[in-house]
Every structure is written in C-alpha cells, then in structure tokens.
Amino acid sequence: MRLAFWLYEGTALHGISRVTNSMKGVHTVYHAPQGDDYITATYTMLERTPEFPALSISVVRGRDLAQGVSRLPATLQQVEEHYHPELSVIAPSCSTALLQEDLHQLAAQSGVPQDKLMVYAVNPFRVTENEAADGLLTALVKRYAAEGPKTAAPTVNLLGFTSLGFHLKANLTSIRRLLTTLGVKVNVVAPWGAGIADLKRLPEAWLTIAPFREIGQTAAAYLEETFGVPTEYGTPLGVEPTLRWLRAVIEKLNTVGAKEGATPIAMPELHAFSLDGMSAPSGVPWFARTADMESFSNKKAFVFGDATTTVAMVKFLRDELGMQIIGAGTYLERHADWVRKELDGYLPGALMVTERFQDVAQVIEDEMPDLVCGTQMERHSCRKLDVPCMVVCPPTHIENHLLGYYPFLGFDGADVIADRVYISCKLGLEKHLIDFFGDAGLEYEEPSASSENGSAPLSAGTATPAAAPEEGGMAWTDEAETMLKKVPFFVRKKVRKNTENFAEENGESRVSVEVFRRAKESLGG
C-alpha cells in the first residue's frame, strides 16, 4: 500500500535514468509493461533542458508472454537505428524480474554489437533510486576508465552531479568558480554532460571531488584504488566547510603536484572568491551577528533529508546561524550510521530514520519547530501546520529546478541558504499584520462562517479566521477565538494546542478569555 502514498526515493529505474539521462550518447532501454515509461514525463516537467529524455521502453505484453516471445531484441535494433547511441543500458523491471527473463541472452539476439550494450541487472525489488544510480555510475567507470598520463596542469574530476540533482547547474557553477579562483581546471564532470570518451579520461585527473555520499563516492573510491587518483569527499556547504574544503583540495593537489614537479598552489586572498573580487566571499559571518539574526538563537529547527544534506544543514544552522536543533533524520537507512557519527553532539535525541513521511509529519506537529528544512513532502506537511519550511534536498518539485543562479554549495551557496532561512522564518509578518489589523480599512471581504461552537458568524470585515480546533478538540468562546487571532499565524496552532492542554489539566471544559490569559501566564507568554 506504500505506493499509494509519497515515497522519498524513486524506483531503481529512476536512479538509472538519472545517470543515463545526464550523459551524452547513452540511452536507456527499459524492459517493462506499458505505462512504466512515466519517468519521461518527470524529466520533461522538471528538467530545464531542451533535450528529450534518452529513454525507450521495451513493452512486456500478455500476448507476447503467451507466445513465448520478447520485444526487447527488436526494441534494441530500433534504438540503434534511430538514436545511434554509443551505449544502450538495458534496465530490468519488477515484471521482468518475476518472469526471470535472461536479459543478457535477449540482448545478444538483437544483432547490436555487444560493446554497445550494457545490461544493468539490478534487483528492482530491493534496490531504490540512489543505490541504483551510484551502482550504475560505478559500473560505467569500471567499464570505461583507462590508464593514461596525468594532465600537465592540475585538474579535478567532479563526480555525482546527475540529472534532476538539487540545484544541479548552480552548484556546479559555484564549484567551478572556486576551482577557477585556485587556478584549477575541471577534467571531467560525470555523469552530468559526460560521454564515453570522458569516462575514459577520468584517471588523468590529479584529484576526484565527490561531495555527495549518495552518488559518486563509490566510483571515486574505485578510481583511487585502481588508478591512484585521490579523492576529496567533503561537502562545501556553509562558510567554514567551504574553507576546510578549499584547504583540503589544495593540500591533496599539492601532494600530487610534488610528484609531478609542479608549482604548489597557494590559497588566494578570500576576496578573490567573491563575485566582485573585492569584498568578503560571503555575508553570512557578519549577517549572523546582526540584531535580526541573533534572535535566531532562540529559534528551533528540524532537518530531514538525504544523508549529505541532513548532516551539512544541521551543522550550518547550528554552527553558523546559531539555531537550536531539536531533531534531525534521514530516509536513507544505509547511510544512517554515517549520519549519526557526523552529528554526534548536535542532536538532543536519537536520529530519526524512516521512509514514512507520515512519521516525519507527526514529529513536526508534536514539536512545532520555527523552521523545517526538508523535502517536498515536508513542504506539504508544514503547509497544513502553518510551519515555515524550506526544501533543501530531493524529492523536489518544479519550484526547486530553477533557471536562475541559486547554489547551495560554496560561499555563494551559504548566502543563498542564509537568505532562505531568514525569509522562511520571517516572512509571514505581512499576513500576521493583516490578521491583526484586518478591519482597518482593507477593501476585501471573506464569506461569513459559523464558529466552531455554533454561535454567530464572523463579521465580513474580519480577516483570516483563527485556526479551527482539531477533531475532538476543546470548544472556545468567541472572545477567546478573537484573542487567538491576534497571535501570529505561524505559531497559532502551537498556542491553541498548549492552551487546550492547560485547560484540560486544570479541569476546564472550554477555553474562555480568562482561561486563555491564565494559560499564557503559566507558559511564560
């Protein structure tokens, strides 16, 4: 029944296609029932690129099964004749796994040269999006990476940047800007924009940068083990992490450079990393000490997402913005131990590990934090609860695939995140003022509606009604409801809940103005 609800991770096909759709001259052939090619709609809706997704479906039909035939060989021939890919990756589906079809044998019957075919026989029942993507990228690197001479000047590989990646192009631009300032060129970005020839050149780089634990680090480890290409695994999210990342990159490049007889790379002046080349590279350090941001030390944040982002965001919010972390979690169980280790000392309790968005929504409702950093699922949950939320990692929706420059990595990314945090927490003041001064000459009306206890309808001049009690909640008098409306909307639900708890503990059957005032005093309001 889980498929009837949202899922944090997509299927294995989703991960496979994220890799192949990122590359040039690579096509995916999915052997599955009709309708499983829905993935193409995802890319055309979200990906801001002019190319159509490089994916075809080899349809599994009941008639073909009854006749003991398969359409896969013919589909491979059609793909070869129409698209002329350098490589076709054949992906199984749950249906073909149940049928126990031999995809290697079927591919051999197609007549397409075997060096242009790759069967990625992942178990579609057990493997999900990120694991499938990481596995396919690693398989491609193992197949094509070839020994070659090091580049004359210092270069790096950037691994793990894939189609539908969070703020993909902006993050790549930010990383490239940092490297350019160091005088370092990019050898290969993979899989995004890479072809087969690029994969062959991976061992020529001096260093591999793999900032995402979910995708790319396994392939980077293979390059290091097989070809001796060192790897930098750090994620430059935040000002201090970016500085540490730069120092680590310089140190590792200079280690290789010493063997090559190259001139050592020196850390430039910090202003060299800024957009204008004259000012500080990020405004976060001073912004965090302003009166506006110092008030954030009392604000509580909850973070939920993939492993890389959860760790990086928790550290950024606490270390650089001074917010209180009331909890964090991840939907990637296989990376949970790493997240726990990285966040040791940052969390007041245990790390939350779940694939059920309902569990995350319940924690948010119970804690009512001042800010939630999560996924598209948390955005939906927080909307119902009037809790500020910013999306920081997949799964995402169209508003997180932007044309503009909004990186999350590097110094530029630190500024973007700080702005998003500030806006997410602070905006809403206008709505609160409308709630508070709703009858001060505003030229709009809302339909009258009866209050919860069946009394007279609210006046037409009244702005947004107070939050209605949940099912089974306590009754409120009209006067108490009016007082509740003067509470900012983004904490109104929490105030209602706390007041009702106070009333129940004190034997009150309903919330009156007097009960509301006593509750406010007892809670320190």
UniProtKB/Swiss-Prot annotation:
Q: Give the family per the record.
A: Belongs to the ChlB/BchB/BchZ family.
* SUPFAM superfamilies registered for this protein in UniProt: Helical backbone' metal receptor (SSF53807)
A single GO molecular-function term is: oxidoreductase activity, acting on the CH-CH group of donors, iron-sulfur protein as acceptor
Question: Organism, per UniProt?
Answer: Chlorobium luteolum (strain DSM 273 / BCRC 81028 / 2530)
Q: How does it assemble?
A: Protochlorophyllide reductase is composed of three subunits; BchL, BchN and BchB. Forms a heterotetramer of two BchB and two BchN subunits.
What's this protein's name? Answer: Light-independent protochlorophyllide reductase subunit B
Positions bound to substrate: 428-429
Its annotated pathway? Porphyrin-containing compound metabolism; bacteriochlorophyll biosynthesis (light-independent)
| Residues at the active site | 292 (proton donor)
Q: Name one GO biological process term.
A: light-independent bacteriochlorophyll biosynthetic process
Residue runs in coiled coils: none
Cofactor(s) needed by this chain = [4Fe-4S] cluster
**Purpose:** Component of the dark-operative protochlorophyllide reductase (DPOR) that uses Mg-ATP and reduced ferredoxin to reduce ring D of protochlorophyllide (Pchlide) to form chlorophyllide a (Chlide). This reaction is light-independent. The NB-protein (BchN-BchB) is the catalytic component of the complex.
Q: In the UniProt record, does the keyword Iron occur? A: yes
Q: Which gene encodes it?
A: bchB
Q: Which UniProt keywords apply?
A: 4Fe-4S, ATP-binding, Bacteriochlorophyll biosynthesis, Chlorophyll biosynthesis, Iron, Iron-sulfur, Metal-binding, Nucleotide-binding, Oxidoreductase, Photosynthesis
